[in-house]
Curated annotation (Swiss-Prot):
Observed effect of gene inactivation: The thymus of knockout mice shows a lower medullary accumulation of dendritic cells. Animals have a defective generation of naturally ocurring regulatory T cells.
Region spans: Disordered: 92-114
Transmembrane segments: none
Main location group: secreted
Record organism: Mus musculus (Mouse)
Cell compartments where the protein resides: Secreted
Listed name of the protein: Lymphotactin
One GO molecular-function entry: protein homodimerization activity
């Protein structure tokens, strides 16, 4: 009885390592299978990811959350990346801008004496 219990306990302890090995066969979530050749409107692109996996690609993420793989060597892809980077740097510059001039106080405390 003790031998059976000890064997069962040993199998339970080894199970996590055996199951972990099976998961390595699953493809990664963001891997590209094929590349988009048709030009994507730049105004629909929110951001992009440069993918260096089995297939080198640029993954564009649209404003609706769709992920589209494209050839990083295509001219339209390079132009889209420049545009998206330009928008990001413009937003960053606007966020870093400090307003000049005096600002009025927004505190409107009223003191009553009686």
């Amino acid at each position: 009885m003790r031998l059976l219990l000890l064997t069962f306990l040993g199998v339970c302890c080894l199970t996590p390592w055996v199951v972990e090995g099976v998961g390595t066969e699953v493809l990664e979530e963001s891997s590209c299978v094929n590349l988009q050749t048709q030009r994507l409107p730049v105004q629909k692109i929110k951001t992009y990811i440069i993918w260096e996996g089995a297939m080198r690609a640029v993954i564009f993420v649209t404003k609706r959350g769709l992920k589209i793989c494209a050839d990083p060597e295509a001219k339209w892809v390079k132009a889209a990346i420049k545009t998206v980077d330009g928008r990001a740097s413009t937003r960053k510059n606007m966020a870093e801008t400090v307003p000049t001039g005096a600002q009025r106080s927004t505190s409107t405390a009223i003191t009553l004496t009686g």
